[in-house]
């Protein structure tokens, strides 16, 4: 980099105080993102909903299931405990329906957390930034969509993903079932994709 490049970059630096908290924040580490995302989640004055993943592994191998520092199960992007609220900024971490733009990295806001009479969360309604994202999903599940149609809520359901219990061949596989979402006010610069950042 030239001295002029450095000068230009330094002229673009802003302090945290001057940044709108709702704009997308890029950080270097998952820990920094988690701190910011949890702080933003705590600002929303509605009840917190915690959804635990269902994790299965062959008998005697459950202790081999690894949970990363940021809560991901095995080598998947699904989290062991998903903490969300209506109004939370989220992104998909799994290709739900690629031709319907419900792809890994698609971002939006939670407009509904639908529970059964027993309190089981059966789907999460997300208003995606790209209005056409989820059109087919909304048509496929008209009853679920109708509840959140005024806010263009697309129903997102749990998905199951398999993962290896270790790097060794034939070490066994486990499965995790969880909503393919994560908080997204902040993301690592590594995970950001220009196509997913709307103006």
Positions of PLM-derived features:
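Conserved helicase C-terminal RecA-like lobe
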Residues: 96-97, 102-199
């Amino acid at each position: 980099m030239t001295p002029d490049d450095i000068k230009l970059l330094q002229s673009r630096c802003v302090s945290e105080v001057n940044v709108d908290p709702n704009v997308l924040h890029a950080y270097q580490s998952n820990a920094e993102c988690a701190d910011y995302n949890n702080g933003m989640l705590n600002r929303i004055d509605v009840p917190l909903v915690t959804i635990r993943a269902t994790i299965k592994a062959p008998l005697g191998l459950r202790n081999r299931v690894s949970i990363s520092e940021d809560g991901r199960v095995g080598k998947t992007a699904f989290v062991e405990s998903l903490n969300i609220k209506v109004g939370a900024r989220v992104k998909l971490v799994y290709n739900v329906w690629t031709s319907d733009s419900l792809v890994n990295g698609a971002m939006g806001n939670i407009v509904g957390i639908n529970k059964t009479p027993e309190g089981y969360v059966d789907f999460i309604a997300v208003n995606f930034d790209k209005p056409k994202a989820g059109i087919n999903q909304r048509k496929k599940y008209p009853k679920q969509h109708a509840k959140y149609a005024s806010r263009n809520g697309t129903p997102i359901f749990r998905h199951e993903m398999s993962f290896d219990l270790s790097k060794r061949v034939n070490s066994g596989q486990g499965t995790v079932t969880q909503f393919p979402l994560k908080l997204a006010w902040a993301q690592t610069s590594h995970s950001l994709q220009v196509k997913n950042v709307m103006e």
